[in-house]
């Protein structure tokens, strides 16, 4: 079962401003990535369940995080149906991220008070997700919509919390554009945990990148406030 409630997870998303995304079939490599991100200050990790036996990999990574990385909140992304969401919640997923708005997933997550973040691409979808109890809207793909879309939504709906995924990088200008538009946090995958990092096993470099990116986000948010 989830260790953190949806409100606790949402609070950490807002506080840190970033959710790293990662998938790899190698459990030991996954542990190294988790540790590197944790050392860099990340306290959230979205494991994107895109490969065969991904549930086995997540189960081991979550056990590792619970045992060795206190405060690391593990969630699962790329979930497309309620059955998969339920299975990963049984393995301790603290949040569920989906590429589209699925009401069946909303129901199973809400029963357990687990945060779910559906991929939305219109104000109508965002409104429906919030009616279903969504705390954090995933804007996907972020590269298609851009900061201008976020700013337009936040005008009439300043209460809406948005997390763009896709089209987000560690570049200062990119991050400033998103946070100036009013996002709550950003999801970052290959731009943060790149193929070269994994191929070269440059975990110290990953720790530095995570640390620098979180510091940059904190700086941008402090100027806004």
Regions found by a protein language model. Give the residues of each.
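Conserved N-terminal beta1-alpha1 strand-loop-helix module at the mouth
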Residues: 1-83, 87-91, 200-223
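Hydrophobic faces of well-ordered beta-strands that scaffold small-molecule active sites
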Residues: 17-22, 45-47, 74-77, 96-97, ...
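Generic hydrophobic/aromatic pocket-lining and core-packing "Φ" positions
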Residues: 34, 58, 85, 106, ...
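Generic structural signal for hydrophobic
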Residues: 36-37, 61, 88, 109, ...
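Glycine-enriched alpha-helix->loop->beta-strand junction motifs that scaffold or abut catalytic
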Residues: 41-43, 68, 89-96, 111-117, ...
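Glycine-rich phosphate-binding active-site loops on the catalytic face of alpha/beta enzymes
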Residues: 43, 95-105, 139-147, 182-203
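Catalytic cores of alpha/beta
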Residues: 81-91, 124-132, 169-186
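Histidine/lysine/aspartate-rich catalytic loop segments that bind and position anionic ligands
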Residues: 95, 99-145
